[in-house]
C-alpha cells in the first residue's frame, strides 16, 4: 500500500534529504582531510590517530541513523546540525593547513636575485623626477661588469644624459659631491658602503631620483641531507640590511650560525661580527668584511663562514628588515632587558637600562641595530641581536603562541624570508615540537677580533674598519659548535 503523504511525513522526507546532503558533504570533507593529514605529516601520532578515529566513528553514527527505519525528525535534524558543524570544523582545519603549505611553498630559494642601481642627486637638487634629467651631467665609473653596463643601457633608454665617466667609484662620487656633475649612477649596495666609509659623502643627504632593477639568474643553494628531528645541524641566519623584496642583493649585517642538537634540545648561537675580516670563498689577495660577502650572494656568505670556522652549514635562513618587524609584530612583541638607556625618535623607541621591556617589531629592529650608544658598538650589537633571536625562539616554541598566532606568523613572513630547508623537514620539526613540546636550552658565543683599518677586496682603494681575526676565538667557536653537535 502506498504511504499517504502527511505533513509529518513530508517534513521527515525533507529532513532526511537534507541529512543525506549534509552527510555527503561531511564524508567528502573528512576523506580529503584525512588524505591531507597523511600527505603532510604535521600532526604527531597522538593527535593524528584520535582525529581519524573520531572522523570514522562520526561517519558510522551518521550512517546508522540515516538508514535506520522510523528515525525521528529531531534525530535527522540533529544529524544535519552535527554534520554541518563538523564539516565547518574540518574546513577551519583546512584553513590552517592551507596557510602552512602555502607558506612553505613561498619561502623556497629563489633562482634569481635583484640588483638595484641608483641615480643619486643632492638633496637640494632642482630635479624632482627622472624625466627632467635629459641633458644633465651624470657621473659613471669604469665598472665593466655586464650588470652595470646593462643597467646603464636601461637608464639611457629612458633619458639622454651627458655621461661623464670616471676611472673608479671614488672619482664618480667625488664628482657629484664637488658639484662637477648633477648626479651619479651607482650600484645601490655600493652607495650604502660608500656612505659608511667616505667622510665627504652621506647618502642621507642625497635623493634617489630613479632606480634601475635587474633580475639576475642564479643557482639555488642546495640543502644538506639531514633529518632535523634526529640529526644535529647548522643553520646560517643571514640578515640583510634592506627592506622590500627578499631577493634583493645587499650586505649581510647579521651572521649567526644556529647549531641545533634535537637529541639534547640544545641550541648554540654563534655570531660572527659584520666587520670581521675574512677571505671571501674562492678569492685570493685582499681580505674583506664578512658583511660584503652578502653582495655576492647567500652562497658566498655560507662558504666563507664554512671556510672560517671549518664547519658544514646544512641550511640557511635569509631575512631582511621587513622580516624582523613583521615576525615580532605577529608574535605580539617580545621582552628584552636593555643594558643601556637611549631613545630613538624614528620609531619613538625608549630603552631603559635594567628594565625588562615589551618591544614591537620596529623597536626590536632598532634595538638589534643600535651601536652608537655603546663603547664597543659593533661587538655590543651582537649581544643585542642574540637577545632578540633568543626572545623570538622562546616565544615561538611556546604552545600558546603557536596556537593563537599561527596564521599571522606565517602570513607575516611569506614574502620576506627565504630558506633552503625542505618543506618535509619543517613538517617533521613541527610534528616533533607539538608532540614533545621540549624546552630548548639556548647558549651564546661570538668570535672576537681586533680593530684595524685596511683595504678590502670590495673597496680596494680605501682603508676600511675591520675586526682582525683572533685565531684562538675562531678555534673556540669551532670547538663549541662541534661539541654541541656531537652530544648524544
Q: What residue spans do the PLM features occupy?
A:
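Internal/C-terminal transmembrane anchor helices
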Residues: 73-96
Amino acid at each position: 500500500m502506498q504511504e499517504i503523504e502527511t505533513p509529518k511525513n513530508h517534513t521527515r522526507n525533507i529532513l532526511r534529504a537534507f541529512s543525506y546532503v549534509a552527510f555527503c558533504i561531511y564524508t567528502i570533507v573528512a576523506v580529503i582531510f584525512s588524505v591531507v593529514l597523511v600527505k603532510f605529516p604535521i600532526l604527531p601520532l597522538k593527535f593524528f590517530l584520535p582525529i581519524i578515529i573520531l572522523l570514522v566513528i562520526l561517519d558510522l553514527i551518521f550512517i546508522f541513523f540515516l538508514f535506520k527505519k522510523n528515525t525521528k525528525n529531531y534525530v535527522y535534524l540533529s544529524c544535519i546540525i552535527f554534520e554541518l558543524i563538523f564539516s565547518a570544523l574540518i574546513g577551519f582545519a583546512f584553513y590552517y593547513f592551507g596557510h602552512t603549505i602555502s607558506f612553505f611553498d613561498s619561502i623556497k630559494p629563489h633562482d634569481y636575485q635583484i640588483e638595484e642601481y641608483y641615480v643619486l642627486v643632492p638633496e637640494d637638487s632642482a630635479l624632482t623626477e627622472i624625466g627632467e634629467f635629459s641633458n644633465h651631467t651624470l657621473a659613471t665609473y669604469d665598472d665593466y661588469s655586464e650588470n652595470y653596463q646593462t643597467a646603464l643601457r636601461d637608464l639611457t633608454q629612458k633619458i639622454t644624459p651627458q655621461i661623464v665617466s670616471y676611472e673608479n667609484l671614488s672619482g664618480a662620487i667625488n664628482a657629484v659631491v664637488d658639484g662637477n656633475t648633477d648626479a651619479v649612477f651607482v650600484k645601490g649596495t655600493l652607495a650604502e658602503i660608500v656612505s659608511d666609509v667616505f667622510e665627504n659623502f652621506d647618502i642621507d643627504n642625497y635623493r634617489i631620483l630613479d632606480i634601475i632593477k635587474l633580475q639576475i639568474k642564479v643557482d639555488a643553494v642546495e640543502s644538506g641531507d639531514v633529518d632535523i628531528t634526529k640529526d644535529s645541524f647548522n643553520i646560517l641566519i643571514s640578515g640583510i640590511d634592506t627592506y622590500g623584496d627578499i631577493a634583493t642583493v645587499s650586505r649581510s649585517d647579521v651572521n649567526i650560525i644556529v647549531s641545533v642538537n634535537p637529541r639534547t634540545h640544545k641550541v648554540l648561537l654563534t655570531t660572527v661580527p659584520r666587520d670581521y675580516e675574512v677571505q671571501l670563498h674562492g678569492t685570493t689577495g685582499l681580505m674583506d668584511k664578512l658583511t660584503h660577502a652578502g653582495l655576492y650572494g647567500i652562497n658566498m656568505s655560507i662558504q666563507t663562514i664554512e671556510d672560517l670556522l671549518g664547519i658544514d652549514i646544512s641550511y640557511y635562513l635569509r631575512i631582511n628588515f621587513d622580516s624582523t618587524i613583521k615576525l615580532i609584530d605577529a608574535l605580539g612583541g617580545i621582552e628584552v632587558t636593555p643594558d643601556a638607556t637611549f631613545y630613538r625618535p624614528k620609531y619613538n623607541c625608549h630603552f631603559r637600562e635594567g628594565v625588562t621591556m615589551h618591544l614591537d617589531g620596529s623597536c626590536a629592529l632598532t634595538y638589534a641595530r643600535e651601536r652608537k650608544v655603546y663603547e664597543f658598538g659593533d661587538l655590543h650589537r651582537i649581544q643585542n641581536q642574540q637577545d632578540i633571536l633568543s626572545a623570538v625562539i622562546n616565544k615561538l616554541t611556546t604552545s600558546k603562541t603557536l596556537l593563537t598566532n599561527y596564521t599571522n606568523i606565517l602570513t607575516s613572513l611569506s614574502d620576506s624570508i627565504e630558506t633552503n630547508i625542505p618543506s618535509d623537514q619543517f613538517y617533521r620539526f613541527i610534528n616533533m615540537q607539538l608532540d614533545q613540546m621540549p624546552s630548548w636550552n639556548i647558549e651564546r658565543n661570538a668570535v672576537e677580533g681586533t680593530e684595524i683599518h685596511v683595504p678590502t677586496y670590495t673597496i680596494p682603494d680605501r682603508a676600511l674598519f675591520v675586526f682582525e681575526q683572533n685565531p684562538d676565538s675562531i678555534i673556540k667557536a669551532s670547538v663549541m659548535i662541534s661539541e654541541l653537535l656531537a652530544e648524544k
